Regions:
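N-terminal signal-anchor transmembrane alpha helix
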Residues: 5-24
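Small-residue-rich segments of transmembrane alpha-helices in multi-pass membrane proteins
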Residues: 44-47, 107-121
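Juxtamembrane boundary at the C-terminal end of a transmembrane helix
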Residues: 121-129
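Structural signature of hydrophobic alpha-helical transmembrane segments
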Residues: 11-13, 75-85
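Transmembrane alpha-helical segments of integral membrane proteins
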Residues: 86-99
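Core segments of alpha-helical transmembrane spans in multipass integral membrane proteins
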Residues: 44-67, 83-87
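Cytosolic, membrane-interface loops and tails of multi-pass inner-membrane proteins
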Residues: 25-45
Length: 129
């Protein structure tokens, strides 16, 4: 296993860990993304468990399995997840400028999403150097 594979596994652990915790504690996911479910409607809680929980956990878990098993295409799969994280950071930068949303939290999140994207994309990037 290469250093870039271990980097991607760390990214999977972080993203998947966040997803797993969001499935267990949707209120935590709500706080992290600064969104609230509509009071009195249970579908909002289901959305946090499903999207921020299940989607994040299972996509990162499968990428981790593929990397750890050395499956063909694992680097591309992890890089696709990385592109999603990087894209979230780009969208946040756009919001910082267009919406005048410069805050310490937004700055931190841009860095976090960019680093996580780089960790996940590392095997694909290294394989093409």
């Amino acid at each position: 296993m290469t250093l870039s594979d271990m980097s991607a596994l760390l990214g999977c652990l972080i993203g998947g860990g966040m997803g797993f915790y969001a499935m267990l504690r949707p209120s935590w996911a709500s706080q992290i993304v600064r969104l609230q479910a509509t009071p009195g409607l249970v579908e909002g809680k289901s959305e946090f468990r499903g999207t921020y929980g299940g989607l994040f956990f299972f996509s990162h878990a499968l990428a981790a399995y593929a990397i750890a098993s050395g499956l063909e295409g694992a680097a591309l799969g992890a890089a696709i997840l990385g592109a999603g994280w990087f894209g979230a950071g780009v969208g946040r930068v756009i919001s910082i400028f267009l919406d005048r949303a410069w805050t310490g939290l937004n700055a931190f999140n841009v860095g976090f999403e960019s680093v996580l994207g780089a960790l996940l994309a590392a095997p694909l990037i290294v394989s093409h150097l």
